[in-house]
Amino acid sequence: MNLQHHFLIAMPALQDSVFKRSVVYICEHNEDGAMGLIINKPMDQFSVENVLEKLKIDPTPRDPAIRLDKPVFIGGPLADDRGFILHTPCSDFGSSISISEDTMITTSKDVLETLGTLKQPKNTLVALGYSAWENGQLEEELLENAWLTTPADKDILFHTPIAERWRAAARKLGIDIHNISTEAGHA
């Protein structure tokens, strides 16, 4: 089972403060474990513009039609000082890795320098921190019914309103997440 380019959808019973009602986009899943970013937990009062100001990045030439007041997401509980940018394909950046045909991840500063300009990727999601699982850990959590999985959808990733992403991801499975019992059982 390879869950790269899939969503993990937190089950209602998962009450961990970081992962409660979360949708995690899995960027990498292999024999070493898994790595992903939470895509529906924005940081309080912290925007892409704030990140650029803090890093003293002034993208030029600035296109005022491109909004920089988009939220920065809490990617996960690990390394919350590290930035990750999910974006639609663009080959101009130093450390971009293709996750799927329509999604890449970049960790280099050069992508930040394009935000707010016509050179930026068409769609972007900026996160600080990440989520990770050791080899076998995610599979164990799936067996414990902590998560649902579904192939990722770029519309949910980049266009669905943040507050609706958890329900929208579950709807891809034909599920109303609010109707799922928090109790596991056997038929």
UniProtKB/Swiss-Prot annotation:
InterPro entries: AlgH-like. Pfam families: DUF179. GO terms for cellular component: cytosol. Belongs to the UPF0301 (AlgH) family. This is UPF0301 protein ECA3925. It comes from Pectobacterium atrosepticum (strain SCRI 1043 / ATCC BAA-672).
